[in-house]
Amino acid sequence: MSEEKLKAKVEQASGSLKEGAGKLTGDKELEAKGFVEKTIAKGKELADDAKEAVEGAVDAVKEKLK
């Protein structure tokens, strides 16, 4: 797992905790902030997945061209 993906997972967990705490306490602002943090982190994770896939495809093409 890449460092970027690990950071994204930690941010997702943090966002989920904030969202849950907001729901539990009725704090809609905290709930919304947690949801946004979690969603952005998921986007970062997906971007890292795409980056890794492209890098893998480039490496495969390079191998075939040798």
From Swiss-Prot:
Q: Which domain of life is it from?
A: Bacteria
Q: Which SUPFAM superfamilies match?
A: Hypothetical protein YjbJ
Under the heading Pfam families, the entry gives: CsbD
Renumbered residue ranges of the record's region Disordered = 1-22
Q: Where is the composition biased (Basic and acidic residues)?
A: 1-10
Q: Its family?
A: Belongs to the UPF0337 (CsbD) family.
Instruction: Please report the name of this protein according to its UniProt entry.
Output: UPF0337 protein M6_Spy1542
Q: Which organism is it from?
A: Streptococcus pyogenes serotype M6 (strain ATCC BAA-946 / MGAS10394)
Recite the lineage of the species: Bacteria, Bacillati, Bacillota, Bacilli, Lactobacillales
